Swiss-Prot record:
It comes from Leptospira interrogans serogroup Icterohaemorrhagiae serovar Lai (strain 56601). This is Acetylglutamate kinase. Its EC number is 2.7.2.8. It comes from the Bacteria. Belongs to the acetylglutamate kinase family. ArgB subfamily. GO terms for biological process: arginine biosynthetic process via ornithine; L-arginine biosynthetic process. It is found in: Cytoplasm.
């Protein structure tokens, strides 16, 4: 009897997913992959299995990835000094060569191989391939003590100006899973390093994705150390204004707002340290992390 109860419990888990499979089949979900989920072997495997399962039930995942720790490791090994200004890496020509080599040549291909090893058909590209994205240099705004805010040039760091999703549509139609490295060109043909969260938001908007999911190393958006499970634009802006959303969480929530402005229905900031967090978010009634919607 106990065995039968356990089997029925498993069946109920599958049945819980059924309405969500029906709802999202044929739809695009953009996932920003980074943090601990990229570093730990068990989490990497669970991520790859999640992505392959999504594809097999008719959902179209598109992956945008980071890779900061790998970049730092190679720069250290090559004894290339790294300068940061207010948390932003100053990226000269030499550093950009390393960034592109690591992101597009190493990390991207590792993710492709990981997904393919679980039965998927992943293809790795960057923003430069198929004219996917065009970018422009993006100086940062800093405030020095006793002075007004001013722009500071951090080198070959960019923001997305436009996205042409044709290559992604073609890959999806052919049954492939696009894996995108956050490197794009400007009008002068220079390679620029793009914040992966920001890039994911722009990709989601261009594809009119059903969902944007950001994997992070936190439960979601925490206010007074409590997880906030649901927010809208006004609430996010209010938390930023009060300083309750700050630091590295700001570009994450802002990319969610950008995606929403471009037609993405739901955006999620979830804990990538939790095994199978993507499946928990998409296929369970409770979900996981923080939801931001219009």
């Amino acid at each position: 009897m106990f065995l039968m109860e356990k089997l029925l419990e498993r069946v109920n888990y599958i049945l819980e997913a059924l309405p969500y499979i029906t709802q999202y089949s044929g739809k695009t979900v953009v996932i920003k992959y980074g943090g601990a989920a990229m570093a730990k072997a068990d989490l990497k495997e669970s991520f790859a299995k999640d992505i392959v399962l999504l594809k097999y039930v008719g959902i179209h995942p598109v992956i945008v990835h980071g890779g900061g720790p790998e970049i730092n490791r190679l720069l250290d090994n090559l004894k290339i000094p790294t300068e940061f200004v207010h948390g932003h890496r100053v990226t000269d020509n030499q550093t950009m060569e390393i960034v592109e080599m690591v992101l597009t040549g190493k990390v991207n291909k590792q993710i492709v191989s990981l997904i393919n090893s679980q039965g998927g058909k992943a293809v790795g590209i960057s923003g430069k391939d198929g004219n996917l994205a065009k970018a422009t240099k993006a100086p940062i705004e800093i405030e020095l003590e006793g002075k007004e805010k001013q722009l500071f040039d951090v080198g070959l760091v960019g923001k997305i100006e436009s996205v042409n999703p044709e290559i992604l549509h073609n890959l999806q139609k052919a049954g492939f899973i696009p894996v995108i490295s956050p490197v794009a060109e400007n009008s002068e043909g220079e390679s620029l390093n793009i914040n992966a969260d920001t890039f994911a938001g722009e990709i989601a908007g261009a594809l009119k994705a059903e969902k944007l999911i950001l994997l992070t190393d936190t439960q979601g958006i925490l206010i007074d150390n409590q997880l906030v499970t649901g927010l809208n634009r006004n609430k996010v802006k209010d938390y930023i204004r009060k300083g309750e959303i700050s630091g590295g969480m700001i570009p994450k929530v802002e990319c969610c707002l950008t995606a929403i402005d471009q037609g993405v229905r739901r955006t999620h900031i979830i804990d990538g340290r939790v095994s199978h967090s993507i499946l928990i978010e998409i296929f369970t009634d409770q979900g996981i992390g923080s939801l931001i919607e219009s």
